[in-house]
């Protein structure tokens, strides 16, 4: 880089080609020796929050930024050389093309630094970039000089020179629109003609005789394979465009040796690919437009439904052009597509079939969306959800096992809930009676589903110190009443309350339990800690459990669960205990206190084990009958 000071008064540097794992701390450690840094920002993707592989480093002084640009450009950070240039905030200057040159036919070994070192002698460089893909250099690059004069010097000296044994082309940078306009202008004055579909018996001489009548030809070539046999196409280069145009007009579509030949303007590979891409996109758009309102997406299909059954289910609503159940490994993926002949038929099918039970499952039927449309919709929905979350500061989503109140409670004052309400709101275990894992939000209150408003932790379930204590003697004596009303200790305390106090009423809606309506109306009940006592073992309280290390907590609960389960199912006690220990600790504490709740969960676990054993027995019987060895 020339010692001349750049014309940019800013002290901000653009740092590109970063490794995805590079952090602001790494960049600070790298650039701080150059001088005081005001800020560093790695630009990130809005959706994934992943690095966009470039950053801005803002120095306090311009001379420090220039020193970093001179000494640190192309230094390696996490195995990748970084590309540094002045930050240009004005997009019109970045895209003007002034001082920007294009270099092509570069050797694969030429990287950003090698190209930078080669062209730095011609002037002050703002940016130097060799275009690469996953396979390395694509053989061309761009160099942006500070001045137009420096770019002209580079073009004059470098165009046609040998670089690593290859002759490079260096020219003024042109935008895509300019290049396409030039190609279009040249296409109208074409001298070269492309001929195809003339068979294998054609050679250069015969092709020259065939097209020589239209005018003088500079060259004629029939393309051949390794054995010298014609590939069925070739080229003729005329001296004048008029002769080439005449050959195309007269020969295109004529029959030659029983075949209809094609004669047209010879195109470069890039032109042909662009034209084919444009044609394909047009066909794709036409197909999308045609099927946009007649193609239906059907999901939640029963495993036994195939293409024929899907067609039969939807055939009463109109003419079906196609019906397809998506498969993977010979098994249904649970969704498919049905295409009707008219929008009216498709609309009627959506109205009638959405929610209808076919086989054993209710169907979901809607108009099919393209992948891009669906991704755009989901992205928009995600951004709206994130915006609503950011609008409520200092709030987090409650973890599984915490319950949200419909009305915020008075600070430091928690309401008392009967055990029956707690039991209904407790999280389900990770296994069910059918042996399937439930959805993470299955059976949860609607208030804590994804997308619902979030609340501070201060409004969550009451602290353990406020849960009424029930001694083991009371628990045994009042087993039959514990799941239908307040616990005896709380009931006795409430009975001793003066009659002038109003007993609070609760309103339970949508599975969400509410706090008491008025603080003054709450009975003055002294809450004590929940205690669980098992014969021959030390009393286990919630605070004692919480103070133990996480790995010790399950052990403490397991030691108290095992003897209780062993009394019910001596042979399966070990397996059942292991299954129950997957449940949340607060649920396990409640189960230790409530024999009914424990027995219910034990019965579910036994049902799961029996179903699993029956399945294994059936599989063994099938394997024995078919001669397949059992593992």
Swiss-Prot record:
Top-rank lineage group of the source organism: Eukaryota
Record's keyword annotation contains NAD: no
Modification N6,N6-dimethyllysine occurs at: 361
UniProt modified residues of type Omega-N-methylarginine: 426, 430, 449, 513
A cellular component annotation (GO) from this entry: extracellular exosome
Domain PABC: 537-614
Residues bearing the modification Phosphoserine: 315
Protein localization: Cytoplasm
Biological process terms in GO annotation: mRNA metabolic process
SMART domains registered for this protein in UniProt: PolyA (SM00517), RRM (SM00360), RRM_1 (SM00361)
GO molecular function, one term: poly(A) binding
Function field: Binds the poly(A) tail of mRNA. May be involved in cytoplasmic regulatory processes of mRNA metabolism. Binds poly(A) with a slightly lower affinity as compared to PABPC1.
PANTHER family, per the entry: RNA BINDING PROTEIN (PTHR24012)
Protein name in UniProt: Polyadenylate-binding protein 3
Originating species: Homo sapiens
